[in-house]
Amino acid sequence: MNILLDTNIIIPLEDTSRVLDSSFAELRKLSAEQSHCLYIHPMQLEDINRDKNQERRKIVLSRLKQYSQIENPPILSDQECNELGLSQSNDNDKVDNNVLFALYRGAAHLLVTND
């Protein structure tokens, strides 16, 4: 199974400056035991690059290399955005909508998010 991780999961999962939540540890353990692949969406790099905490941003970006990226993810057009009733009032919305659209179009089987 291909599991897409939301940015709000990636940051605490890879932030070495805080104690890892047990649910995140369980996610990593079970995905490895069951041979599930954890993915990130390429647009999530934009989200992480906007992190105001420079040290955390540097750490998380360096650790993203351990995840597979969705190759050639579907890009949400303005028309599809309107048809699906999504709003994109800021950069975060754009990234979130494209992550959801990748799931919608079958680029991953499951999205893990804290939203």
Label every model-predicted segment.
Residues 12, 47, 102-105:
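Residue-level signal for well-ordered alpha-helical scaffold segments within enzymatic catalytic domains
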Residues 33-37, 68-73:
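Short C-terminal domain-edge/linker segments immediately following a structured domain
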Residues 5-6, 39-42, 92-96, 115:
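Histidine- and aromatic-rich ligand-binding microenvironments
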